[in-house]
Amino acid sequence: MGTTTSCDDFLEVDQYEILPSDYMFKTEANVITGLNGIYDTFYTDQETKLGDDQVWGFKPHVFAANHPTMDCQASGWDAEWQRHAWKPDKESLESAWRMSYRAIDRANRFLEGLATADPSIFADSKSQAIYEAEARAIRAYNYLYLTKLYGRVPMLVPGETYSSTPSKPRPETLDENYATIEQDFVYARDVLDWEPLNGQYGRVTKGFCKAYLAELYMKKKDYNSAKAELKSIIDDGPYKLEPCYGNLHNEDTHWTKESIFEIMYHKQDYMGWGANSSSDAMIWFGFMCAAPEWGGWGSMCLSWELVRSFEPGDKRRQYSIVAKGDTNPFTGQTVGVTPSFDGLFQGSENMPTVYSLKYWRCKPGDNNQVYNPISLTLKRLAGVMLDYAECCFETGDAATGWEMIRQIRNRAWGNLEPGATVAYFPKDWLNTETVEVPDAQTYYAQYKAKKGYTSDLWKVAVIMERRYELNAEFSLYHDLCRMGMCDEWFKAEYPKTAANSTPDECLKTGDSFRYFEHQAYQELFPIPTNEILSNSAIGPEDQNPGY
């Protein structure tokens, strides 16, 4: 939102022991404050010091969606992600469970109280329904995220909180989860507008609801319903492709015309050490994502396989990746010029000397800037267009599917750039005239044959365009799992050969050493250990298979 009010303390249980239980619902101003407290759960929690709560939104979201594909890699305890070695006690998975249910808990408390509010306190007759819609949409978003990670999860409803209902079983089927999520999104979709309430960007909107409702339908393989929601976003929504791909992740530049929903991290007066003591709107992308050669921690490297797979002319490579020999256009630092960092890999764990320009946009700690004002853009139009393409192919409309891919690739080759401006990249990176873009069907037919994919041509095209368009964002591994493509992905993109049979061999070739064979059970993550220990209705026998 333009100004997001933090209500962490206001919504904690102990506050209900001090204030009357209906205090939040006596005035409309109090209702809005309570609603803002639910929005606060999109942000990090800088007080708990638990798991990855301090980088919530980035971890585990980006890690669970990318590192298991091996396109993104990390050292230290985060190496478990790309090695498929995660366990039920992994802190990131604990954070995902805890933080998602924190949002659900707040939404349930709010919805229970809102239903008792006197309608006369609202200045507009529609306001109460709008506040309900926003709360239900956020609850549905969190439930949907939990199902992507864990499958069946306990469903707390208004009247049930983590305190009042510490023990609740998983439902028998995913359909029970999906039914509640669908009801919430449909209600919110029909109440909310395309534009955010009061022009406060950061609030959920009709576009948010439609995009995530479509995601739910795609999980259910109801492609016709998903297609209708996605088509509406493209045809009726206010969104357009940003002309320059490089403008999508600029520092302190929020809500491009392409953005459907993002979590804004603004530039603040003080962003040095200790700034997080007064604000949860702090996150340190720079330290996590910069090259270790230049002060990074090694949490976000990209693979040489990803780098080598880009087609000549695809500008998404230069706008989103900086590799050995490249110079970061924001910091002026060249990768691989320092002894011990000058190979294809660096460090004792052999991390690729390849990094994401989406998040490494400053010198970490330089001028006492510890935290970074870059939005987490959870949904944008390009992703919706690729989802729509998939649904078109699944419903027999191949021509429209290929047209969506054509439009995405047209922007990727810079053909929307003539006449555009770029905020931070060198201006001479912009195209001044249009160029010819290779035909996607022709190219991917050759790529499919070369790599040995067995899926339909359109599936290869869609997943590869997601790879390039949404690298290091929020969906790739989840899409591979949903589409049933994981096994062939690893065989095609990260094959085990004589040339990469050991880590030492990989040092010579730039290949990533794959520590695992794909197992279908790992397309879900394990229920966190703490939940099994504390929830008497979920025992070890209820753990996801394989863990």
What does each model-identified segment do?
Residues I32-N36, D40-L50, D71-Y150, E172-E176, ...:
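Conserved, well-structured interaction surfaces
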Residues C7, K59, A64, C72, ...:
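Long, intrinsically disordered, low-complexity segments
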Residues G332-R380, G546-Y547:
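Active-site beta-strand/loop architecture of penicillin-binding DD-peptidases
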Residues D8-W77, Y178, V186-Y187, R203-G347, ...:
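An aromatic- and glycine-enriched ligand-binding surface/loop that stacks and positions planar moieties
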